[in-house]
């Protein structure tokens, strides 16, 4: 009797989260190296806010927890982590100074907000100061991913230096994305100015919105965070005197050749 044909092996669909090479690289610096483990350690109200006493005075309480129980000190030096944390505190206090008065209480970072900003510090430090090593580490992570895949279509091409100047964030609804973006702007400027001079700014900082209503809303939000911001003005955008202003434009006006 003829043998029945072998059943074809069904291709296993790779989980989207497993394809986030940059995310995997960032998590490799920590212990636990997954969000679930970090959440279990940090997601407690007593760890929110700033330390006021002891060796870690001025640091976040998250920093103290990470140093004591979580951080793999062989991967990132503890003094580097301390600097990252102080930068986060500095930027967060700047954008919440006016908001604290409006709210009548001090706004503290949640653990997921802190991790997003901590990862940004690590990324920007590597990008501006250790780019060659960063590129190599990312490609090692990518090669490991490719080796684990059995289907050619799931193979990724190696990172190139020009790929590193773009980064995207994925934050849940209600996670405070607007405030995180404001801190991200300050984080980028901090590293940019450290490399190029304290009084230098990028040619333009542009915030793109989906409509005029959100442009107005973001203008107010940026003002409340202490930024110089304005709705997009083509003449201003060409003038180096306004480089410290954030230009806000809705995407419907990108093709406007007159404005």
Predicted regions and their residues:
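RecA-like P-loop NTPase motor core of helicase/translocase proteins
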Residues: 2-259
């Amino acid at each position: 009797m003829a043998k029945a044909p072998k059943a074809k092996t069904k291709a296993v669909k790779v989980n989207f989260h497993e394809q986030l090479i940059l995310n995997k690289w960032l998590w490799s610096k920590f212990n636990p190296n997954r969000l679930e483990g970090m959440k279990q350690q940090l997601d407690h109200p007593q760890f929110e806010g700033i330390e006021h006493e002891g060796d870690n005075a001025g640091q976040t309480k998250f920093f103290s927890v990470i140093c004591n129980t979580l951080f793999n000190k062989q991967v990132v030096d503890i003094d580097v982590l301390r600097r990252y944390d102080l930068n986060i505190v500095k930027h967060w206090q700047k954008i919440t100074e006016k908001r604290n008065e409006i709210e009548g209480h001090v706004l503290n970072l949640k653990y997921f907000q802190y991790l997003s900003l901590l990862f940004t510090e690590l990324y920007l430090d590597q990008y501006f100061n250790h780019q060659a090593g960063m590129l190599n580490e990312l490609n090692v992570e990518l090669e490991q991913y490719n080796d684990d895949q059995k289907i050619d279509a799931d193979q990724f091409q190696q990172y190139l230096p020009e790929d590193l100047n773009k980064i995207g964030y994925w934050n849940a609804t209600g996670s405070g994305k607007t405030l995180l973006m404001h801190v991200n702007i300050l984080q980028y400027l901090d590293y940019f100015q450290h490399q190029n001079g304290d009084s230098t700014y990028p040619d333009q900082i542009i915030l793109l919105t989906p409509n005029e209503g959100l442009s107005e809303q973001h203008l107010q939000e940026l003002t409340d965070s202490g930024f110089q911001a304005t709705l997009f003005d083509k003449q201003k955008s060409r003038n180096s005197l306004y480089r410290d202003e954030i230009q806000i434009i809705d995407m419907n006006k990108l093709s406007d050749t007159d404005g």
